[in-house]
Amino acid sequence: AGVNHNGSLEMAKEMARVAKECGADIVKYQTAVPELVVSKFAEKAEYQKQTTDAAESQLEMIRKLHFSFEAHKELKEYCDSIGIQYLSAPFDVPSVKFLGTLGLPLLKIPSGEITNLPYLEAMAAQKTPVLLSTGMSTLDEITDALGVLDDGGCPEVTILHCNTQYPTPYEDANLTAMI
C-alpha cells in the first residue's frame, strides 16, 4: 500500500480490508519522519506536479502522505483485528526504532537506504528478519549491506531483486542477476 492511501487512515484501513478479502497475508506501508528524509528545498518531480498541488514543496506533499507514529500504531491494531499482517518500510532511524516497539515479525528496508550504514545498524539492532530491497544497488553495495546486517545480529535477510522504474522495461529486468 506504501503511501497510496493519500494520507487517509480510513483509506489505508480499507486497503488492508480489501487485501485481506483478496487472500493477501501481509499489507505493507511506509513509515517516515518527513523532515528527516526530504529537504525543504527539494522540488517535486514533474509527474508529482501533475497529480498534486504544483505550488506545494516536496516536503509539504510528503507531510500530507505520511502518518504519525500514533496513526501507524492504530493501523497495525486494525490489521491485527482483521487478521492480516501489518508490515512497514521505515525510512529513517526514529521510524526503525518506533516500528521495533510494535513487535513486528518482519521489517522492510527500502532500496534507497541500502547504503545508509547508521540506518542498517539500527535495523539489525531490532533483531527482526528483514526484506532488503536492492533497486539502484551494485552487488558490492548489497554485499556491504548484508555484512552490516549480519554483524549487527539480524537473524534473517530476504533479498528482493528490485527495479525502481515502474513499469520496468523488459530489457532492464535483468532477472539473471538473481542466480
Question: What name fits each language-model region?
Answer:
Residues A1-I179:
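Catalytic cores and adjacent flexible loops of soluble metabolic enzymes
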